[in-house]
Amino acid sequence: MVISDYFEIERAYAKLNLYLDVLSKRPDGYHNITGLFQTIDLHDELEISQIDKRGEVRIETNIEIQGTNLIEKAFRTVEKFYNVGFGIKVRLKKNIPMGSGLGGGSSDAAAVLRFLGRKLKISIKDLLILAAEVGSDVPFLIVGGTAIVEGRGEKVTFLNPISDYRVDLFCPTISVSTKFAYQMIHESTYAKKPDFALKLYEAYLKRDHNQIKALSYNVFQEIMTSKYPQIQDALDKAQRCNPIVAMMTGSGSCIFAVQADKGKYRFIEDVFQHL
């Protein structure tokens, strides 16, 4: 097999759910959500190159990939709609913890879609449609930055970026299944306040720390902290840092603490500003 010496580097950025609620369960088995999503500068790094063998996906990584391989799923999804006359080799350096709610696997898939989009001249609009076929977080992570996300994740409204905030992460060494998390919640736990995501965004822009704390919400947090003492311990540790707000991202297990002027990671603009 001939492998090109030429590769492109893609960064797959982690995401935070600054707000996350479930509005209803859909007939197709998915859930309608509403959320305020934000990328931070923690990222996986992918070296992606074309290989001659059509349809082959080769992945080399520093850790074992668990569950569905979203990198391969991204490639197969593009194959269904486009004439992809090559395979790909991906060297993946994982920095985003798996099963943490930080969207690492989805962001890796989005990085592969961006690569294929350039090679096959696929528009961003069409990439977003393909991304929705791959996974619920993938459309947002094609672009990243700051966005209101609705539907099952396919409806993304990109917003002017929230800037000048930093965040620390407190990630217990447990992995939470998204499928399991959705099985644990029920309609009585839904906040059903779809306007709160936009109100929270406005509070971040105004740097209104009291409103940020009051409006921040994750529908999974109460259930997951009661189910997993390690997540509650991480939340307690984060709150001792006196942040603007500390909360869980996604369905867990990672806790983030938002700070005004300190913290290891920072909020970033869309991914195209950081390639």
Swiss-Prot record:
- Per the UniProt entry, the Enzyme Commission number(s) are 2.7.1.148
Q: Which Pfam families match?
A: GHMP_kinases_C, GHMP_kinases_N
Metabolic or biological pathway, per its Swiss-Prot or TrEMBL entry: Isoprenoid biosynthesis; isopentenyl diphosphate biosynthesis via DXP pathway; isopentenyl diphosphate from 1-deoxy-D-xylulose 5-phosphate: step 3/6
The signal peptide annotation in the UniProt record is none
GO terms for biological process?
A: isopentenyl diphosphate biosynthetic process, methylerythritol 4-phosphate pathway; terpenoid biosynthetic process
- Residues the record marks as active site: K15, D137
Q: What PANTHER family does this protein map onto?
A: 4-DIPHOSPHOCYTIDYL-2-C-METHYL-D-ERYTHRITOL KINASE, CHLOROPLASTIC
Q: What does this protein do?
A: Catalyzes the phosphorylation of the position 2 hydroxy group of 4-diphosphocytidyl-2C-methyl-D-erythritol.
The UniProt similarity line reads: Belongs to the GHMP kinase family. IspE subfamily.
Q: What is this protein called?
A: 4-diphosphocytidyl-2-C-methyl-D-erythritol kinase
What species was this sequence derived from? Pseudothermotoga lettingae (strain ATCC BAA-301 / DSM 14385 / NBRC 107922 / TMO) (Thermotoga lettingae)
